């Protein structure tokens, strides 16, 4: 069983989201070099429209609501004065396909089912957490770009212990059938002893 990989970074306010990311996307060989957006719009736009994204309508961005307006989401992040986390949650392609995490709907359902738990790991009151994500089918590793923040900034952070709990929680959910099979096999061996 492989594991879930989570890369996480944050910006102290929405205006700087995409600052370092701008260099990253401008160096990607498959990215349209003519992107001329405000820094705040770069990350959500990149996540929602880059090559490899699986769209759900006009773009690939999804969130807590059924429909996400990309322009409105970008403005919301730009005007946010607190911490904005930019995360990439990734699975190996073979695992994603085998376990059914090869569609945006599967990832949306996973993130929606875990949103209150994720909020608690980041020290965000559940009712104040806001998030957006986009699923990318990149060769070798399928992943979601996950943007989250506290609508009422103050007190949010992610310590190493909670990062590990967050990762373990996603791993246990994604690989639950495989884990059950392993536990059942172990129990069967114990019963034979």
Stretches with model-predicted labels:
Residues 1-193:
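N-terminal nicking endonuclease/strand-transfer module with a His-rich metal-binding environment
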């Amino acid at each position: 069983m492989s594991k879930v990989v989570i890369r996480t970074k944050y910006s102290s306010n929405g205006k700087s989201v995409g600052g370092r990311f701008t260099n990253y996307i401008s160096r990607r060989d498959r990215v349209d070099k003519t992107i001329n957006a405000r820094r705040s719009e770069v990350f959500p736009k990149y996540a929602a429209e880059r090559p490899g994204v699986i769209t759900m309508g006009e773009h690939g961005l999804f969130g807590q609501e059924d429909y996400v307006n990309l322009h409105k989401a970008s403005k919301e992040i730009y005007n946010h004065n607190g911490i904005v986390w930019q995360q990439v949650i990734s699975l190996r392609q073979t695992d994603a396909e085998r376990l059914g995490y090869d569609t945006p709907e599967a990832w949306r359902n996973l993130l929606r089912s875990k949103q209150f738990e994720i909020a608690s790991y980041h020290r965000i009151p559940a009712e104040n957490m806001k998030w957006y994500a986009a699923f990318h089918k990149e060769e070798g590793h399928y992943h979601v770009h996950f943007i989250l923040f506290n609508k009422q900034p103050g007190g949010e952070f992610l310590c190493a212990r909670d990062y590990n709990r967050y990762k373990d929680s996603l791993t246990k959910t994604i690989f639950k059938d495989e884990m059950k099979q392993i536990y059942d096999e172990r129990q069967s061996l114990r019963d034979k002893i």
